[in-house]
Amino acid sequence: SLLKPYMSLPENVDSLIFRRGGELSGEFNELYNALFNKADRYINLVKLLSTRREGFTRKEIEATTGYSGGSLTKMLDNLERCDFTVSYSQFGNKSKLTLYRLADFFTLFYFRYVENNRSRDDQYWQHHFMDRSVESWEGFSFEEICLRHLPHIKQGLGISGIATESSAWRFIPQKGDERKGTQVDLVIKRVDKIVHLVEMKFSESPYTISKEYEEKLKSRRNLFMEMTGIKRGVVITFVTPAGVSHGLHSSIVHSQLAAKHLFADILEKTISL
């Protein structure tokens, strides 16, 4: 392992990535050049994908990059085979609306904190890991972990034996529509006609739902039902590290899971040892 046990995590990150000559300071370009011919095209593509958490449709990728046809198909396939990206359907399962999302943590971290870092500060991460931007990074990372543990989410909800379809949903208002755009990064549609709108929220303590956020959740659920034509059975599920705090506005939560559900297999093995 490159991690040094006598160092804290921020110290290790600085030593590996931000220190000049660090073992991973040049890893990004070396990695892409080692894996792909015409690596610059792949880097341009993943850089675009890094700018939108929910991902891009192929049409959006073509319009922005100018890549198209078989060469774009090959690039998207190669990136997914190497686990840099994931593709998933939008609710309704229309293949033309497939979303391509950047899922590699190192690539995401590179574009967010390394590529444009001109500070030349060998202790950059120690000086900035408590910044607000890192809080949003923690939230994004937690969402990505949740999406990679979908079978555990189903298991925690007690629906492992029920046929389901997992997708994303987003609403983009047309010109003249005053409603705001919104999205749900994980929608689980069950064969028994229950639909889970899954909220994945990072918090070091039990997550507290405010009055404003409760209203936002209600509005989003109503919009989802209106746009999809689903009349009933749409419920809100939360996945958080430590659960949802019981309060005045928590009744909107139909079901909730915590980190222990995402890592149930590991915890069981640890206990058995």
Would you name each region that the model predicts?
Residues 1-26:
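Amphipathic alpha-helical "lid/sensor" segments that cap RecA-like P-loop NTPase cores
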Residues 45, 57-64:
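A short acidic, leucine-rich amphipathic alpha-helix
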Residues 37-54:
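Short amphipathic alpha-helical interface segments
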Residues 80-91:
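A short, conserved structural fragment
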Residues 18-42:
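Short alpha-helical segments that sit at the start of domains
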Residues 91, 98-273:
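A cross-kingdom feature that marks ATP-driven nucleic-acid transaction machinery
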Residues 65-82:
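Short amphipathic alpha-helical interaction segments
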